[in-house]
Amino acid sequence: MVMKMLREIVESFEDLVVIDKPVKKELELTKFLLKYKDKPVLFKDVEGWEVAGNLWSSRERIAKFLNTDNKGLLELLYEAMEKPKPFSVVEKAEFLKNREKVNLLELPIPKYYPKDGGPYLTSAMVIAKKEFVNVSFHRMMVLDEERAVIRLVPRHLYSMWKDSVEHGEELEVRIVLGNPVHLLLAGATSVAYGVSELEIASAISLKAFGRPLEVINLDGIPTPVDSEFVFKAKITDEVADEGPFVDITGTYDIVRKQPIVIFEEMYHVDDPIFHALLPGGYEHYMLMGLPKEPQIYASVKKVVPKVHGVRLTEGGCMWLHAVVSITKQHEGDGKNAILAAFAGHPSLKRVVVVDEDVNIYDDREVEWAIATRFQPDRDLVIIPNARGSSLDPSGKDGLTAKWGIDATKPLDKKKEFEKASLDF
């Protein structure tokens, strides 16, 4: 299968909304992304650039692109995270055709909301190489023509940067933007230190398209060839204020001192499309939440052998609320599944466990299961003062109360809870 660049992918979407009129990158672009929140949008003129947003704002669109369905998507991601595959190193890349000095202020980097600290790169991924290759999403707030401040949560890239700083060095990185969804999903996974997200992306690509992920060696760092923009950059030991910024819950994150990135050189394909990822939008939900579903699945599967599906819900920002479908074999399986789900995704605040006859992708069916199969005095699990998500504004000092709803049928009364159905 021939590799598709972003333009071909975008123009293949049947529900694509095209905005032909000029649009400003500060706030105006956001209005269109909010208006068409679940549809892909292509802006033909954002201060001279083409910009696309809401590209992966639905589970079905992602699944279709990866040649699968909702259930298959979970299995695909789970398998890729369990069994990463080597990527392929090639000699050519379309982005090498154009090499320029960086001026971040001239790029269509949006300021999404009025209280944002500045224009934000939101869809960019950072690639760093030490003893292994790490790929991860990091928001970056533009400071001037060549500098931005990067949010580094204490995970793998932070560890690499910290090691460089302690040795009196800057961390050399490649920043990529405008990539297909298999790389975006891989970049949002949380895997063990030493596992390369490029190999997870390659496993997804092999399963979905029959070919591995292709990269080019760009001065020592593997860089995906299907990138619209590539930046050579360095993360320094200097810091600056980062934020405010609207995170996945739609609320503003706090201002912190974070490292400064210096952008040294820019590459891009001919007529590139800039990917604008709306903070707190459906696309943000999908790309951040979908890679957590296999982790919940793996955790629940350790205590309940038959797990049929996991869904982080849009109403819970695909971060705080989940639904899990199981086949109950013993009384207590529902509660064990609840506890395992919380262990699989520690940011989770609420989980509903249902039987396999309930469609977890239909909120009405899930609520029906709660209404007809759940009794609060018997089936509710509450865990007070647990470590939760820092993104939950109702929590305090990282602590939250978690609650689980066991909406499964009692094994000794299955017939009394049978759903009426008719084949036609």
Swiss-Prot record:
Does the record bear Flavoprotein in its keywords? yes
* UniProt GO MF annotations: carboxy-lyase activity; metal ion binding
Does the keyword Flavoprotein belong to this entry?
Answer: yes
- Cite the SUPFAM superfamilies for this sequence: FMN-binding split barrel, UbiD C-terminal domain-like
Alphabetical UniProt keywords: Decarboxylase, Flavoprotein, FMN, Isoprene biosynthesis, Lyase, Manganese, Metal-binding
- What is any Pfam family matched here? UbiD_C
Enzyme class, top EC level, equals: lyase
The protein's annotated catalytic reaction(s) are: (2E)-3-methyl-5-phosphooxypent-2-enoate + H(+) = isopentenyl phosphate + CO2
Required co-factors: prenylated FMN; Mn(2+)
EC nos = 4.1.1.126
- Annotated Mn(2+) binding sites: 134, 197
Its GO CC terms are:
cytoplasm
Report the InterPro entries cross-referenced here.
UbiD, UbiD-like_C, UbiD-like_N, UbiD_Rift_dom
Give, as in the UniProt entry, the pathway in which the protein acts.
Isoprenoid biosynthesis; isopentenyl diphosphate biosynthesis via mevalonate pathway
Q: Where is the active site?
A: 247 (proton acceptor)
What biological-process terms (Gene Ontology) are attached?
isoprenoid biosynthetic process
Q: Which cysteines are joined by disulfide bonds?
A: none
Task: State the family it belongs to.
Answer: Belongs to the UbiD family.
Q: What does this protein do?
A: Catalyzes the conversion of trans-anhydromevalonate 5-phosphate (tAHMP) into isopentenyl phosphate. Involved in the archaeal mevalonate (MVA) pathway, which provides fundamental precursors for isoprenoid biosynthesis, such as isopentenyl diphosphate (IPP) and dimethylallyl diphosphate (DMAPP).
Recorded protein name is: Anhydromevalonate phosphate decarboxylase
The scientific name of the source species is Pyrococcus horikoshii (strain ATCC 700860 / DSM 12428 / JCM 9974 / NBRC 100139 / OT-3)
